[in-house]
């Protein structure tokens, strides 16, 4: 078993390749006799760059091709950004490892202004996320939010070309790719609650491959997994994907988890908030509880309108 080859399915973006290389290095460090190779591939979400994610519709935009490689035996594991991973897995696959989380916050990036508060009225801000858009406009309704897709390098290039006064990106991606100096300020989770799983890397593999599960065990970070479990349970209860205005963030407080959740109108006119605390062993139940609080406040109507506009259930 120690001489086994592990084939990693990964997207081809710089950030996805960084994540796959990170997993490769961790595996080789834990198991020096292991041979680890990367299988880069293009996902549907990578091909459809001319429309907002919410308009494209469907879940698993960035993972389906990788899962197909696992099911067909072409790859042994798939490495994902946890915020892109759907709640449900194809039969025969599962999520067995969640690596330690990087900074989960959103980052404010601008060549002119140091923070969101410094932006003049009417400034153009780029983001592809309805979650970020809702929270930005709730705080600053005087801003113009403009569609922004593409990988990290592409988005930074568009900012540098003067298409935007500022852009909002995940801090984790910038840090991992060596662009930490481009972050003018990290936005507090109080002002921009992150997406579920943001900053965490997950490893998916075949459920029947028990030997592989054991090889992956040293990469698993229990605290991150507990937090992400609560966040994903909230998302699942709300039937959310990575392209809807749902935010959630859990932190550990001793022997308890504190989970905050949010559902927002994309125009920022309404933000529904809920939070809860529970023992660590009840992470999943906590996610459902906070989601139910949001549903009781009217979250379903907001999300139904978003899905209806996007043309998918």
Swiss-Prot record:
This protein's pathway: Porphyrin-containing compound metabolism; protoporphyrin-IX biosynthesis; coproporphyrinogen-III from 5-aminolevulinate: step 2/4
SUPFAM superfamilies, A to Z: Periplasmic binding protein-like II, Porphobilinogen deaminase (hydroxymethylbilane synthase), C-terminal domain
Cellular component GO terms held in the UniProt record: cytoplasm
Modified residues (S-(dipyrrolylmethanemethyl)cysteine): 242
EC numbers for this chain: 2.5.1.61
Catalytic activity, reaction form: 4 porphobilinogen + H2O = hydroxymethylbilane + 4 NH4(+)
Pfam families assigned: Porphobil_deam (PF01379), Porphobil_deamC (PF03900)
Class of the enzyme per the UniProt entry, highest EC level: transferase
Cofactor note: Binds 1 dipyrromethane group covalently.
Keyword annotations: Porphyrin biosynthesis, Transferase
CDD domains tied to this protein: PBP2_EcHMBS_like (cd13646)
GO biological process: protoporphyrinogen IX biosynthetic process
Leftover remarks: The porphobilinogen subunits are added to the dipyrromethane group.
Subunit (UniProt): Monomer.
Family from the record: Belongs to the HMBS family.
Protein name according to UniProt: Porphobilinogen deaminase
Species in which this protein is naturally found: Pseudomonas paraeruginosa (strain DSM 24068 / PA7) (Pseudomonas aeruginosa (strain PA7))
Record lineage: Bacteria, Pseudomonadati, Pseudomonadota, Gammaproteobacteria, Pseudomonadales
Gene: hemC
């Amino acid at each position: 078993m120690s001489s086994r080859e592990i084939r990693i399915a990964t997207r081809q973006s710089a950030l996805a390749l960084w994540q796959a290389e990170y997993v490769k290095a961790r595996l080789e460090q834990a198991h020096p006799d292991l041979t680890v190779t990367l299988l880069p591939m293009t996902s549907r979400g990578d091909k459809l760059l001319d429309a907002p994610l919410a308009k494209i519709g469907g879940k698993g935009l960035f993972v389906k091709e990788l899962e197909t490689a696992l099911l067909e035996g072409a790859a042994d594991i798939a490495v994902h950004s946890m915020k892109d991973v759907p709640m449900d897995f194809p039969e025969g696959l599962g999520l067995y490892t969640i690596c330690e989380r990087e900074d989960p916050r959103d980052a404010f990036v601008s060549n002119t202004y140091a923070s969101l508060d410094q932006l003049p009225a009417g400034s153009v801000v780029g983001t592809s996320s309805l979650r970020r858009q809702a929270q930005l406009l709730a705080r600053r309704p005087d801003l113009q939010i403009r569609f922004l897709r593409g990988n990290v390098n592409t988005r930074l290039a568009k900012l540098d070309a003067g298409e935007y006064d500022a852009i909002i990106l995940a801090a984790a991606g910038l840090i991992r790719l060596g662009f930490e100096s481009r972050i003018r300020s990290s936005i507090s989770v109080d002002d921009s609650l992150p997406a579920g799983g943001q900053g965490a890397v997950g490893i998916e593999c075949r459920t029947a491959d028990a030997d592989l599960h054991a090889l992956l065990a040293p990469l698993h970070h229990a605290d991150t997994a507990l937090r992400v479990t609560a966040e994903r349970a909230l998302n699942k209860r709300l039937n959310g994907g990575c392209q809807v205005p749902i935010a959630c963030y859990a932190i550990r407080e001793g022997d308890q988890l504190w989970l905050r959740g949010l559902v927002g109108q994309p125009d920022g006119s309404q933000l529904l908030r809920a939070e809860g605390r529970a023992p660590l062993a009840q992470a999943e139940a906590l996610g459902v509880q906070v989601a139910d609080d949001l549903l009781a406040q009217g979250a379903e109507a907001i999300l139904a309108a978003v899905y209806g506009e996007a043309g998918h259930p």
